[in-house]
From Swiss-Prot:
Catalytic activity reported: Hydrolysis of terminal, non-reducing (1->4)-linked alpha-D-glucose residues with release of alpha-D-glucose
PANTHER family named in the record: ALPHA-GLUCOSIDASE, NEUTRAL ALPHA-GLUCOSIDASE C
EC number: 3.2.1.20
CDD domains: GH31_GANC_GANAB_alpha, GH31_N
Entry similarity comment: Belongs to the glycosyl hydrolase 31 family.
Hydrolase as UniProt keyword: yes
Name the UniProt record assigns to this protein: Neutral alpha-glucosidase C
One annotated GO molecular function: alpha-1,4-glucosidase activity
Organism (species): Homo sapiens
The entry's keywords: Glycosidase, Hydrolase
Length: 914
């Protein structure tokens, strides 16, 4: 039986025909809402029902056709956030509200009711800066800032709410017809998918009938929108037509098409909009299948017809309409009012949490393949990195390392002594990452399956039996991670006595957790499967992978008794997944177009909270040409998560297999990454404590520069580095836009400099990575690169001081032990600030709460843009001692180099240039 199952399941089960995925017009709730929207809005607010308390203002909304009352709640939340919830006032049964995503119950501010016109209500926050203008009939909400309308809700009358009904088809059809004015005659029942929906050979039986919701938002003056990952699409969201909405529905799409709005592995229902002077966000907290339509009306100027000799002209601001539609749940939306990009990032993280602080090793290079065959293969690949002087930090094992795809086991023939293998890696100060998927092989001799089944821990089918689907092990059941008891039990499986063969250098990779179900509808789980609390899968599909990663991260923390930071990579994700680890872009292809699309995909993830993200180097599917592989390593070295990976039917592609010259180029790219690790680690600390993305679109750093608003071929790392990867074959030049008319930019390798506010044609050879340091920044680097991050903890630092046009610079360094939670619990960290002004470089505390002893020294300082040759340079330490410093100066390049220094990184000191 085992052999037969293995023959049945192959790569082709995942490499499915794209026709098995639905487009919008094949989705019943989309068709229903689009059909209804041709009608006039029938919702009005009953302002005589208004009640207000410390938390919220509540009032009824009535559908004039069905007379079914809805309850609207408006909350003011600390930090300039408004929340709108709309639910049935008395539903037949509770409707699903997404739990566990918000870090806590948001802190509210009391809204003050102001007098409005007849038929309207005005609510203001305590400061009076923001106001909600509520119009009764038809129901509409305007969010006003400084007397300017920023967002209008339901201005197009697209509020849609299907109330729950009894399971009696004729009555249900009649009531739904009254509510929505949709033709629900018998011949139209099947097309509208009210009580059952057919797609291919699958029939989705809907026990609660239709339950979809929808609402429109008009963003005044905004034409540039971003967010709502995950799609293999441009960074700036595009206008959509009928049947062309952005789909948020987590799916296993092997070799996904690019520039396509179909949903792939993860969903973050969070959208940002930016214009000159303001950035805003809309967070639609719903975990069911969701579609988003976007339509921009450009600014127009028209003449008012009037009597008299002069016709007055009036300019109408552009506005963009965003229409959210979800299959089920309630309307629960947060409006983030900014006004700056940084403010919006903080507002969103206030709700969903910040990026988890990663262990330092995870910012190094990761080597993965489906699959490394056995312990000898792992040993040989590990030795290959040392032989070719290429640093790396983690070896990865895919599903073949297990016994027949039974997770938490080892193939005894291929990996007879996994602890010995891990001790080999430990001796090199490296780690091991293994895969653990959510499907559990149905096998009465597999202890994980038996224990989960005995305790009722699997997702159920409609009949209440364990749901069964096909995945890599063959017939499998799926753990119900929405159940807290399942998550607690699952996390216990990572304890060292339970997970035989594991050690404390073993970390985790969650894959196939959309969840992927081979031969299921759209390669996933039936929507009428049943979860904890008797909730249908349709209610929470997009949050399944979120819970899987949560449980895995908790397991790694528990095994160390709360002392060590976890590392967990997940393919599927939701809003808030940043709290638990990293995300990658899934099964990409070894094509230039996939290298190019990885940049906007990662930028979109980054601005929606998930800073720790990356794409498989070289493309997971197919065999990359050598030039493409080199360029991908160069791009990946400047992206947050840095992993090479390939599927099982590709040629081996370890970095030394492409000829000596290409090995050198890949080595240089990886070593550049390792040299910059102090800067990377400091950026992740800022993402963790201050909510600022590590990888940033240009518009985030230059919010008043229109040209940056739609750029996606270059980006910022933090505020100091601009990166423009080469993404075209046989390129000899790239056009790089250097923003900021008052900025100066320095080539990271050659130190050539340009004034900002212009496009520069940069020559590129195969060894060129176009990277530019922003004037006014100080970047900490390591002066030597070791075999892994573990070999570099005590190596010396260098500082790259790039002067601004005013001759000043500032930068930071964050340092801790790189692996534990002591930085959080015991304040064992070092946070230093470097500032250069008036020819003096000062090292001082950025945060005096932290203390972390370090013997590391600053050995070299490079000052770029120093305009005159010094007569002397001295260091001044906190004990009052002055020491002369040897220096070299190049008048042609304006570079001042200070070497052979020994300035302790943890103490205050100054470098004085005279």
């Amino acid at each position: 039986m085992e052999a037969a199952v293995k023959e049945e399941i192959s790569l082709e089960d995942e490499a499915v025909d794209k026709n098995i995925f639905r487009d919008c017009n094949k989705i019943a709730f989309y068709r229903r809402q689009k059909q209804w929207l041709s009608k006039k809005s029938t919702y009005q607010a009953l302002l005589d029902s208004v009640t207000t308390d410390e938390d919220s203002t509540r009032f009824q909304i009535i559908n004039e056709a069905s007379k079914v009352p809805l309850l609207a709640e408006i909350y003011g939340i600390e930090g300039n956030i408004f929340r709108l919830k709309i639910n049935e006032e008395t539903p037949l049964k509770p409707r699903f509200e997404v739990p566990d995503v918000l870090t806590s119950k948001p802190s509210t501010v009391r809204l003050i009711s102001c007098s409005g016109d007849t038929g309207s209500l005005i609510l203001a926050d305590g400061k009076g800066d923001l106001k909600c203008h509520i119009t009764a009939n038809p129901f509409k909400v305007d969010l006003v800032s400084e007397e300017e309308v920023v967002i209008s809700i339901n201005s197009l009358g697209q509020l849609y709410f299907e109330h729950l009904q009894i399971l009696h088809k004729q009555r249900a059809a009649k009531e739904n017809e009254e509510e929505t004015s949709v033709d629900t005659s018998q011949e139209n029942q099947e097309d509208l998918g009210l009580w059952e929906e057919k797609f291919g050979k699958f029939v989705d039986i809907k026990a609660n009938g239709p339950s979809s919701i929808g609402l429109d938002f008009s963003l005044h003056g905004f034409e540039h929108l971003y967010g709502i990952p995950q799609h293999a699409e441009s960074h700036q969201l595009k206008n959509t037509g009928d049947g062309d909405a952005y789909r948020l529905y987590n799916l296993d799409v092997y070799g996904y098409q690019i520039y396509d709005k179909m949903g792939i592995y993860g969903s973050v229902p969070y959208l940002l909009a930016h214009k000159l002077g303001r950035t805003i966000g809309i967070f639609w907290l719903n975990a069911s299948e969701t579609l988003v339509e976007i339509n921009t009306e450009p600014a127009v100027e028209y003449t008012l017809t009037q009597m008299g000799p002069v016709a007055a002209k009036q300019k109408v601001r552009s506005r963009t309409h965003v229409h959210w539609m979800s299959e089920s749940g309630i309307i629960d939306v947060f409006l983030l009012t900014g006004p700056t990009p940084s403010d919006v990032f903080k507002q969103y993280s206030h709700l969903t949490g910040t990026q988890a602080m990663p262990p330092l090793f995870s910012l190094g290079y990761h080597q993965c393949r489906w699959n490394y065959e056995d312990e000898q293969d792992v040993k040989a690949v590990d030795a290959g990195f040392d032989e070719h002087d290429i640093p790396y930090d983690a070896m990865w094992l895919d599903i073949e390392h297990t016994e027949g795809k039974r997770y938490f086991t080892w193939d005894k023939n291929r990996f007879p002594n996994p602890k010995r293998m891990q001790e080999l890696l430990r001796s090199k100060k490296r780690k091991l990452v293994v895969i653990s998927d959510p499907h559990i092989k149905i096998d009465p001799d597999y202890s994980v399956y038996v224990k989960a089944k005995d305790q009722g821990f699997f997702v159920k089918n409609q009949e209440g039996e364990d749901f069964e689907g096909v995945c890599w092990p063959g017939l499998s059941s799926y753990l119900d991670f929405t159940n807290p008891k399942v998550r607690e039990w699952y996390s216990s499986l990572f304890a060292f006595p339970v997970y035989q063969g594991s050690t404390d250098i073993l970390f985790l990779w969650n894959d196939m957790n959309e969840p992927s179900v081979f031969r299921g509808p759209e390669q996933t789980m039936q929507k009428n499967a049943i979860h904890h609390g008797n909730w249908e899968h349709r209610e929470l599909h997009n949050i399944y992978g979120f819970y899987h990663q949560m449980a895995t991260a908790e397991g790694l923390i528990k095994r160390s008794k709360g002392k060590e930071r976890p590392f967990v990579l997940t393919r599927s994700f939701f809003a808030g997944s940043q709290k638990y680890g990293a995300v990658w872009t899934g099964d990409n292809t070894a094509e230039w177009s996939n290298l190019k699309i990885s940049i906007p995909m990662l930028l979109t993830l980054s601005i929606t909270g998930i800073s720790f993200c990356g794409a498989d180097i070289g493309g997971f599917i197919g065999n990359p040409e050598t030039e493409l592989l080199v360029r991908w390593y160069q791009a990946g070295a400047y992206q947050p998560f840095f992993r090479g990976h390939a599927t099982m039917n590709t040629k081996r592609r370890e970095p030394w297999l492409f000829g000596e010259e290409h090995t050198r180029l890949i080595r240089e790219a990886i070593r550049e990454r390792y040299g910059l690790l102090p800067y990377w680690y400091s950026l992740f600390y800022h993402a963790h404590v201050a909510s600022q993305p590590v990888m940033r679109p240009l518009w985030v750093e230059f919010p008043d520069e229109l040209k940056t608003f739609d750029m996606e071929d270059e980006y910022m790392l933090g505020s100091a580095l601009l990166v423009h990867p080469v993404t075209e074959p046989k390129a000899t030049t790239v056009d790089v836009f250097l923003p900021g008319s008052n900025e100066v930019w320095y080539d990271y390798k050659t130190f050539a400099h340009w004034e900002g506010g212009c496009t520069v044609k940069i020559p590129v050879a195969l060894d060129t990575i176009p990277v530019f340091q922003r004037g006014g920044s100080v970047i900490p680097i390591k002066t030597t690169v070791g075999k892994s991050t573990g070999w570099m903890t005590e190596s010396s630092y260098g500082l790259r001081v790039a002067l601004s046009t005013k001759g000043s610079s500032v930068g930071e360094l964050y340092l801790d032990d790189g692996h534990s939670f002591q930085y959080l619990h015991q304040k064992q960290f070092l946070h230093r600030k470097f500032s250069f002004c008036s020819s003096v470089l000062i090292n001082s505390f950025a945060d005096q709460r932290g203390h972390y002893p370090s013997k590391c020294v600053v050995e070299k300082i490079l000052v770029l843009g120093f305009r005159k040759e010094p007569s002397s340079v001295t260091t001044h330490s906190s004990d009052g001692k002055d020491q002369p410093v040897a220096f070299t100066y190049c008048a042609k390049t304006s570079i001042l180099s200070l070497e052979k220094l020994s300035l302790n990184i943890a103490t205050d000191w100054e470098v004085r240039i005279i």
